A protein has these predicted regions:
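Recognition helix of helix-turn-helix/homeodomain-like DNA-binding domains
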Residues: 30-47
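The short coil/loop that forms the "turn" connecting the two helices of the helix-turn-helix
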Residues: 20, 31-32, 61
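DNA major-groove recognition helix of helix-turn-helix/homeodomain DNA-binding modules
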Residues: 50-65
Length: 111
């Protein structure tokens, strides 16, 4: 997958759907400048956790819906690490390892 796929987001779509200007969205998110919104919309800047939560609260949509490319990138990275950890734990029979293996298998299957 190309990097442009991972940088795709719908922040501008959500903002425009609700008739907000970049300046108005910046205000709602507690920012001083509309240029910050522009950078997020063009993925020149990645949202930190608080920003992502504010955007979710504002539009009542999950980060994965608003930032699907970024979400997919995170999903792939987690799945890749889950595969490595699964191989490390494979063969262990203690209950905690079995629980972890079940979670890791689920993560790998859904990726």
């Amino acid at each position: 997958m190309s990097m442009s796929f991972f940088s795709h987001n719908y922040l501008a779509t959500y903002r425009k759907r609700w008739g907000l200007s970049q300046r108005q969205l910046a205000y709602l998110l507690g920012w001083d400048s509309a240029s910050s919104v522009s950078r997020f919309e063009s993925m020149g800047r990645l949202p930190n956790l608080m920003t992502a939560l504010k955007i979710e609260a504002l539009f009542e949509s999950g980060s994965g819906d608003i930032f699907p490319g970024l979400y997919r990138r995170a999903e792939i990275e987690v799945a890749d690490r889950a595969k490595v950890l699964y191989r490390e734990l494979e063969g262990r029979t203690d209950p905690k390892s079995q629980e972890a293996l079940a979670l890791l298998a689920y993560i790998i299957r859904r990726s």
